[in-house]
């Protein structure tokens, strides 16, 4: 079932912890030859992605509508990134299904299974892993119960990594960043084992060396 986020049976979902719920989109219809990677730029109200395309650059201003008004968000977005117009505004939830299997014949996939804001661009990797879990369940490599537990654990690891970013705040001292830093952050023991170099296993979609690079950048304690 890949019908997206709008047709969900809400009783089968849990909310994920995340400070964002809205994105404003824009685009510049000219390429930037000097931009060869996706930028993630902190703003007073959240952060913005800047994605280079072949003939354009896409922008997405992520913020919390309960903290920042749409008018203030648009004003900061267009001024900060020198944009002429807005293409779309989307509101979203961060969530995960309690069970990726519904009935005897249906596997939830894509946004029907779960969604986490794009700070670490984890969706494709998660959905590929979900295909693996579905295969393992259908062909009895593992029980569906074990497969469901594995994929939910993976989603929680992704949430923990994203929330780790927010714990360190940004250069902005604003209501949004105060709120983001105040959110519950208590990752599992595996997180600390990998982060401290005691366990050489993948966590979420990251290896031990990814953790080391992150720690070096933020003076991890």
Which residues make up each language-model segment?
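FAD/FMN-dependent oxidoreductases across multiple families
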Residues: 54, 63-166
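Bulky hydrophobic/aromatic packing residues
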Residues: 47, 102-106, 176-182
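Sequence-level detector for tyrosine residue identity
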Residues: 13, 29, 37, 59-63, ...
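Predominantly flavin-linked oxidoreductase catalytic cores and closely associated redox partners
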Residues: 1-83, 131
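Long, low-complexity C-terminal extensions of enzymes
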Residues: 136-221
């Amino acid at each position: 079932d890949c019908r997206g986020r709008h047709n969900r049976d809400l009783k089968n979902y849990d909310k994920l912890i995340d400070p964002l719920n809205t994105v404003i989109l824009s685009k510049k219809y000219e390429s930037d030859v000097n931009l060869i990677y996706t930028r993630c730029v902190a703003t007073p109200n959240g952060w913005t992605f800047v994605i280079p395309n072949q003939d354009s650059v896409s922008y997405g201003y992520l913020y919390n509508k309960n903290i920042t008004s749409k008018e203030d968000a648009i004003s900061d977005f267009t001024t900060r990134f020198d944009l002429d117009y807005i293409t779309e505004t989307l509101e979203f939830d961060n969530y995960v299904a309690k069970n990726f299997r519904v009935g005897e014949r249906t596997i939830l996939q894509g946004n029907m299974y779960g969604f986490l804001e794009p700070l670490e661009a984890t969706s494709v990797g998660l959905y590929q892993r979900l295909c693996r879990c579905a295969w393992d369940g259908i062909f009895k490599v593992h029980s569906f119960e074990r497969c469901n537990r594995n994929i939910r654990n993976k989603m929680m690891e992704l949430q923990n990594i994203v929330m780790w970013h927010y714990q360190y705040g940004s250069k902005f001292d604003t209501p949004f960043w105060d709120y983001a830093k105040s959110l519950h952050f208590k990752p599992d023991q595996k997180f600390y084992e990998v982060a401290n170099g005691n366990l050489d296993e993948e966590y979420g979609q990251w290896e031990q060396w990814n953790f080391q690079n992150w720690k070096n950048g933020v003076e991890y304690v």
